[in-house]
Amino acid sequence: MAGLLSTFDTFSSRRSESINKSGGGAVIPGQKSTVSVFVLGPSVTDDADKLFIATTFLAHSLNTDKQHSQRGGFLVSLLAMAYSSPELYLTTNGVNADVKYVIYNIEKDPKRTKTDRFIVKTRDMEYERTTEWLFGPMVNKSPLFQGQRDAADPDTLLQTYGYPACLGA
C-alpha cells in the first residue's frame, strides 16, 4: 500500500503545475473550471459495489478520449473514496480562487434500473447526465472490461495492467 500511495504523491505533484490553468480534478463536460471530487455516499456499503465503482473509475482514467483529458482526477477521487476524505484532494492541490470545488456523492438507488442502480448527487440535486456519463454504456465498452464489466475481478485487472498502468503513471 505504501508504494501505491507514493505513486499517487508523485502523480499529484506532477499535475500541480497545470492545476491553475485547468482546475484539475475530474472535470466533467461543460464544467471546465470546476474540480469535481467523487466520494462514496453512506448507501454504498457492499464490497462488490465498491469494486465496481473503482473499476469504473479506472476505465475512465485509462480512457484517452478528449472528454477525459483530466483523467487523473478520477484516480484522486478513488483515493478520496478509499479514505472517505475529499479534503485530501483539496489540500493536496491547494486552492485556486477561480475554481469551484464540488463534492459529488455516489449513492445506491434500488429504484433505478439503468446506470447499475447508482446516482450522482449533491445535497441539493441529482445529476442524471453526469450519472449517465460515468456509469453509462461507454464504460462497458472500455478495453478494461472488454464488454464484460460485471465479470471483471481485481486480480485479472492487476495482472493485465499492473498498479502503475492503473494509476496513469
Swiss-Prot record:
Entry keyword set: Host cytoplasm, Ribonucleoprotein, RNA-binding, Viral nucleoprotein, Virion
GO molecular function: protein domain specific binding; RNA binding
Localization in the cell: Virion; Host cytoplasm
Keyword RNA-binding found: yes
Principal location: virion
GO cellular component, one term: ribonucleoprotein complex
Disulfide bond entries: none
Keyword Transmembrane helix: no
GO terms of biological process kind: negative stranded viral RNA replication
Other noteworthy facts: Most abundant protein in the virion. Since the viral RNA genome consists of 15,383 bases,there are 2564 molecules per encapsidated genome.
Subunit annotation: Homomultimer; forms the nucleocapsid. Binds to the viral genomic RNA. N0 interacts with the phosphoprotein (via N-terminus); this interaction allows P to chaperon N0 to avoid N polymerization before encapsidation. Interacts as N-RNA template with the phosphoprotein (via C-terminus); this interaction positions the polymerase on the template.
Similarity section: Belongs to the paramyxoviruses nucleocapsid family.
Function comment: Forms the helical nucleocapsid (NC) in a ratio of 1 N per 6 ribonucleotides, protecting the genome from nucleases. The encapsidated genomic RNA serves as template for transcription and replication; encapsidation by N is coupled to RNA synthesis. Forms the encapsidation complex with the phosphoprotein protein P. Before encapsidation, the newly synthesized free N protein, so-called N0, is chaperoned by P.
Domain remark in the UniProt entry: Ncore is globular and carries regions required for self-assembly and RNA-binding. Ntail is an intrinsically disordered monomeric domain in the C-terminus.
Protein's name according to its UniProt entry: Nucleoprotein
Gene name of this polypeptide: N
